[in-house]
Swiss-Prot record:
It holds the Pfam family TrmE_N. Belongs to the TRAFAC class TrmE-Era-EngA-EngB-Septin-like GTPase superfamily. TrmE GTPase family. GO terms for cellular component: cytosol. Its EC number is 3.6.-.-. Exhibits a very high intrinsic GTPase hydrolysis rate. Involved in the addition of a carboxymethylaminomethyl (cmnm) group at the wobble position (U34) of certain tRNAs, forming tRNA-cmnm(5)s(2)U34. GO terms for biological process: tRNA methylation; tRNA wobble uridine modification. It comes from Staphylococcus epidermidis (strain ATCC 35984 / DSM 28319 / BCRC 17069 / CCUG 31568 / BM 3577 / RP62A). Residues 221-380 form the TrmE-type G domain. Signal peptide: none annotated. This is tRNA modification GTPase MnmE. CDD domains: trmE (cd04164), TrmE_N (cd14858). Mg(2+) binds at residues 235, 256.
């Protein structure tokens, strides 16, 4: 596949130790030769080397920057094209000038994700691996990055390819049956083989889908909302869980006016932790906006930490808030146990039923371990699975696997009902195509463009 040469800045904009301008395509090294001056031309150096020299403006012969240039020749590169990477000092002015020079002499500004898209289109990686690159970049915990790396290395791709190959073998057997319908023994053998292999594939799909809940949490974090009346200790809880003073803590009710969000690793479980403004009726315009945002965060939560004040009886506001969240996954927390107990625990237990109940003192940092263990128990049965497992963490993959499972079940049902093999063949072919969408073998151009548009510029 022929492409033009693209260029972009591959490091974050702003001041820094280094900045990198990356070029990929058939003219990458040629453009480098025009701009670079060193002991040798870039076209003359060995591949996969780093070369010291200077970037020169060809029009003025002015030295623009002192650089180190990496030269990587196709096909042993990320895009399977010639690549050069110009490493210069960090700083907006210089790196932009180098970028402009590369475009002046023949390169085009890359679109978001275009390098990874070329890696996919040139057969370097498949679509699921390409998506995992973005998951890796966005990962917030070691476990999430490991899960993404496993997918980049092709763990999921290998499983999907094996399943598709098995379906092709079934289809080949079905073709024999269709071509020689007069042989009953061939039909019986085909049906037995089809059912055995199809049920095995369905079970493998089931096993992948069983990792979906954990995988999605690994990828996106468990959306955990801390909720309660003002001044019950929500911000103190956020600070204790992330072990940092990100939220302002005072004795003044309504201090938190907005939704605060942090990522934290709790015993191997990545939490997307959200501290909300206390939910109450208020005339304060700013606080009222915060309360509305809190309600929105509640509607999107995987887990709710409902915080109550040990030093106060249950209030009507507590009961009203509980009515909003009672059908969700909730851990109830009695905070401020270092103060005199005025909360009737038996009354609370009657209200919350068998929901998990933890007692804490955020001031004295008591009960935090019990809370972390309860979170882990609630979502992972007390044990987070091995990060080396093959997880399905992408919503698109989960949806396609569910479709594939239904399609192959349709094939099984049809075969067991004695429906003609040419009809069963339709369901099997559909399953093969759906699985192909996961790795990009049968994905539409529109889907591919949409997926890569979510990448950052320069990747």
């Amino acid at each position: 596949m022929d492409f033009d040469t693209i260029t972009s800045i591959s490091t974050p904009m702003g001041e820094g130790a280094i900045g990198i301008v990356r070029l990929s395509g058939p003219q990458a090294i040629e453009i480098g030769d025009i701009l670079y001056k060193g002991k040798k031309k870039l076209s003359e150096v060995e591949t996969h080397t780093i070369n010291y020299g200077h970037i020169i403006d060809p029009e003025t012969n002015e030295t623009v920057e002192e650089v180190m240039v990496s030269v990587l020749r196709a096909p042993k590169t990320f895009t399977r094209e010639d690549i050069i990477e110009i490493n210069c000092h960090g700083g907006i002015l210089t790196i932009n000038r180098i970028l402009e020079l590369t475009m002046t002499y023949g390169a085009r500004m890359a679109e978001p994700g275009e390098y990874t898209k070329r890696a996919f289109l040139n057969g370097r990686i498949d679509l699921s691996q390409a998506e995992a690159v973005m998951d890796f970049i966005r990962s917030k915990t070691d476990r999430a990055s490991k899960v993404a790396m496993n997918q980049i290395e092709g763990r999921l791709s290998d499983l999907i390819k094996k399943q598709r190959q098995s379906i092709l073998e079934i289809l080949a057997q079905v073709e024999v049956n269709i071509d020689y319908p007069e042989y009953d023994d061939v039909e019986d053998a085909t049906t037995d083989f089809l059912l055995e292999q199809s049920k095995r594939i369905k079970e493998e799909i089931n096993q992948l889908l069983e990792t979906g809940a954990q995988g999605k949490i690994m990828r996106e974090g468990l959306s955990t909302v801390i909720v309660g009346r003002p001044n019950v200790g929500k911000s103190s809880m956020l600070n204790n869980l992330i072990q940092d003073n990100k939220a302002i803590v005072t004795e003044v009710a309504g201090t938190t006016r907005d939704v605060l969000e942090e990522y934290v690793n709790v015993r191997g479980v990545p939490l997307r932790l959200v501290d909300t403004a206390g939910i109450r009726d208020t005339e304060d315009i700013v606080e009222k906006i915060g309360v509305e945002r809190s309600r929105k965060a509640l509607s999107e939560a995987d887990l709710i930490l409902f915080v109550l004040n040990n030093n106060e009886p249950l209030t009507e506001d507590d009961q009203t808030l509980f009515e909003v969240i009672k059908n969700e996954d909730v851990i109830v927390i009695i905070n401020k146990t270092d103060l005199e107990q005025r909360l009737d625990v038996s009354e609370l237990r009657e209200m919350i039923g068998d929901m998990p109940l933890i007692q804490t003192s955020m001031l004295k940092q008591e009960g935090i371990d019990e809370l972390e263990i309860q979170i882990k128990d609630l979502f992972f049965g007390g044990e987070v699975q091995n990060q080396d497992m093959t997880y399905v963490s992408n919503s698109r993959h989960i949806s396609l696997l569910k479709q594939a499972r239904q399609s192959i079940q349709d094939a099984i049902d049809a075969a067991e009902s004695g429906i003609p093999m040419d009809m069963v063949q339709i369901d099997l072919t559909r399953t093969w195509e759906i699985l192909g969408e996961i790795i990009g073998e049968s994905a539409s151009d529109e889907l591919i463009d949409q997926l890569f548009s979510q990448f950052c510029l320069g990747k």
